[in-house]
A protein has these predicted regions:
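Amphipathic alpha-helical packing segments from all-alpha helical-bundle domains
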Residues: 81, 102-127, 131-146
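Amphipathic alpha-helical segments within well-ordered protein domains
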Residues: 66, 94, 148-149
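An amphipathic alpha-helix adjacent to DNA-recognition modules
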Residues: 5-16, 25-29, 34-37, 44-70, ...
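Arg/Lys-rich, alpha-helical DNA-contact motif
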Residues: 77, 91-92, 121
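Amphipathic alpha-helical interface segments
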Residues: 14, 18, 143-150
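Basic/polar phosphate-binding segments, predominantly the helix-turn-helix DNA-binding elements
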Residues: 4, 32-53, 85-88, 92-96, ...
């Protein structure tokens, strides 16, 4: 398990270096593999494509923050943890969030966080969300995603 995490993080760090000179939309798997000193088979064992590197890393941070809401961590604390993590890797996420591809971390984050809130809020509150409340959750997450890119 630790080795898998180390390999994934090496790919994340390599993508970060490559994004310093090339937009994520233009980075090729072969270039990333060469720079990370891994084979293509290893890359595809862990990731589906270049965007999956950024979305995996974002999900990894969500596992340590927002996904803990309702499990002993409150809403504010979870968000502070996430934003502190994003700030620690600000250069990576600033560049990764620039892509508007459907698979980009920006669009992925918006979708996955909205879905998580739509699931967790009724569990915590003990009542289903109304259609208006669901719309408010989606607007909140879209706005938060937009503000994260600023």
């Amino acid at each position: 398990m630790q080795r898998q995490l180390e390999t994934r993080m090496r790919v994340v760090r390599t993508l970060d270096r490559l994004m310093q000179s090339t937009p994520i939309d233009k980075i090729k798997v072969t270039d990333l593999c060469r720079e990370a000193d891994i084979g293509r088979a290893t890359f595809y064992e862990y990731f589906e494509n270049i965007y999956a590197v950024a979305t995996w890393y974002y999900s990894h941070l969500l596992d340590q923050s927002l996904y803990l809401i309702g499990e002993g961590v409150d809403f504010q604390t979870a968000h502070v943890r996430l934003f502190e993590s994003l700030l620690q890797d600000r250069s990576f996420f600033t560049r990764a969030f620039r892509s508007s591809d459907y698979n980009s971390v920006y669009n992925y984050g918006n979708r996955i966080i909205a879905d998580h809130y739509l699931q967790i809020i009724p569990q915590i509150s003990g009542k289903p969300l109304s259609p208006d409340e669901e719309m408010h959750v989606r607007l909140f997450t879209a706005g938060a995603a937009f503000l994260t890119t600023e």
